[in-house]
């Protein structure tokens, strides 16, 4: 009965490099600003990713026909079982890349005999993604985004059989060689022969024996241990559809990682930092590629081009008025919270703080997620109304109570009838917060409670400084304060307030002018009426006087009239 077997040659650089341990003492200081309900945690050092370093790992599969083996020993069965597991792993990887051969062709090929495992470290970076990709693989790559574009470019090249043959041929007579790929990339390829020698000299002579006699169970165990890596690689790629992160020790062992770091075009300080920080693995990727009987995957490591510059984190919480009736308060919150790091004369701002990883007092951030700001942004902490930088805020009229856990304490925004306390696990409640924004350090405090929500404070060591000041929200008039401004600034809010005040002043002026006009008209009308009434009264008075005078005056006759009357009477 003809059977097949598999052997694996892992090409790795084993470089003995002394890497001194880096101790980062925690010297955190925290400043709480009562006026803006914010806190700044300082004392951190930067490790900002500015590029990628790409390495290539290839596993070459080939076949060999094995002599008839009729052995029934349990150890022989274990060997056969182990070979079958690897055959299934290879088939799964090929299926993942949609390059799975038919069952008949796979049966004709038989199980691959040898696996040549090489490590190739690229010496430059790439940023183009190939257009023609396998559908299943491409969909996942597009989901990752441009962060791994350089690794994808190399992965595309590895689909070309000629490129893989270049690597294979370069390693025929040497354990270390530089290969130039078709896209202009220079690849440093290295290998060692420890596993190859084991398979050739220890395993295959026993397995290929006619009766498959394996007298020592240690042979089986050692074979399982050495081949466990391929199984894990196949499992990780299968579960993650061709791209894995973080980078496991199966994808790249610690010795291999140190070897790659040693070859990176970075300073010794950067190499030391990368050698001792596990976050390097968390921020790395491995990208799979399969071509016929070659399994290849690209390992992409972060390059921290900016290190040891000061970093600080801004924490903010709602600041509301407390003197008004329930439902009529106004609130203001700084929206510029996140990580800040000095970078080449400016400040790199990372608004999504969770994208940065902290180890001790070292902050690992990706500059792809940052905004570049002027150094004047620091003025927002000490003088939010400064004229050099327009500080970012949001406004509302909803005074919701909450707490923000800082590096060495907690900010507590307590409003309305919510009960807010700080507690010690042994002494119970040690502080009750009044309405407003307050701060408590972690000295003697284990938890902070806001209503029914319990917060656990961090237990880092540091020094906290409470900077008192009048809450700036008290400077604003609730009647003209703009609400629901979610992406605003101090200048924009003040401008809207000034517009509202100007509108009110104009309304008052118009109202005043209308009142004055009405008053003048009323006076004129009243005056005219009074004059008319007076004139009428005067006319009536004169008429009455004249009439009365006429009625009361006797008739006086002259002498001539009287003489005429007398003569008339005598003549009769």
From Swiss-Prot:
A lipid is attached at residue 548 (S-palmitoyl cysteine). Glycans are attached at residues 27, 70, 120, 498. Residues 76-96, 156-207, 479-514 form a coiled coil. GO terms for biological process: entry receptor-mediated virion attachment to host cell; fusion of virus membrane with host plasma membrane; symbiont entry into host cell; symbiont-mediated induction of syncytium formation. The chain crosses the membrane at residues 523-548. The keyword Glycoprotein applies. Disulfide bonds join 37-437, 69-212, 311-341, 320-331, 356-365, 380-391, 414-420. Residues 26-522 are extracellular. Keywords: Cleavage on pair of basic residues, Coiled coil, Disulfide bond, Fusion of virus membrane with host cell membrane, Fusion of virus membrane with host membrane, Glycoprotein, Host cell membrane, Host Golgi apparatus, Host membrane, Host-virus interaction, Lipoprotein, Membrane, Palmitate, Signal, Syncytium formation induced by viral infection, Transmembrane, Transmembrane helix, Viral attachment to host cell, Viral attachment to host entry receptor, Viral envelope protein, Viral penetration into host cytoplasm, Virion, Virus entry into host cell. Changing residue 564 to G: In strain: ATCC 51908. InterPro entries: Fusion_F0_Paramyxovir, Tachy_Neuro_lke_CS. Residues 137-157 are annotated as: Fusion peptide. SUPFAM superfamilies: Virus ectodomain. Residues 549-572 are cytoplasmic. The record marks 109-110, 136-137 as: Cleavage. Residues 1-25 form the signal peptide. Changing residue 353 to T: In strain: ATCC 51908. GO terms for cellular component: host cell Golgi membrane; host cell plasma membrane; membrane; viral envelope; virion membrane. Belongs to the paramyxoviruses fusion glycoprotein family. This is Fusion glycoprotein F0. It comes from Bovine respiratory syncytial virus (strain A51908) (BRS). The gene is F.
